[in-house]
């Protein structure tokens, strides 16, 4: 109730009969017993815990995890190359928001001011979009991820955005992405992307 950003984001089924109450209690105890003072501030601890859970979930999901999770080592490399100290940071397929989290960490680690960046993104998957909202809210990162999950090709949440930094790990080699309905799209300045592969479409959208 205290965080308006998470309204309608968090699940409301914690009381459902099939949920293992003992397991839920163990999870609550785990978070409750963390010694915040010894390991950092509460936002940092909760953020790292959430990131750890995402990575473990990704391990279980295997190849399917690519839809929402990019390994932190890959994201760190992208961020360190671009060095987004200030300006508009954009990810058109933001997954769980890893690019934004690492950007914030980079700025903090280099003595920068996180308030000098503006974060924009979106994701088509409703669950993944909610994961990103939670990931950023936990860390206190302000972001515009659209009012709801949306397909970037068919419902661009930021059509007028002129981003200073674009970081993304799009679903490569995506087929059946709806090319036939976007033949005359104004984004295809360098040619119409092939119907069987969305890679060129992603590149042109970002450009």
Identify the residue ranges that each predicted region occupies.
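Hydrophobic alpha-helical scaffolding
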Residues: 17, 39, 121-125, 165, ...
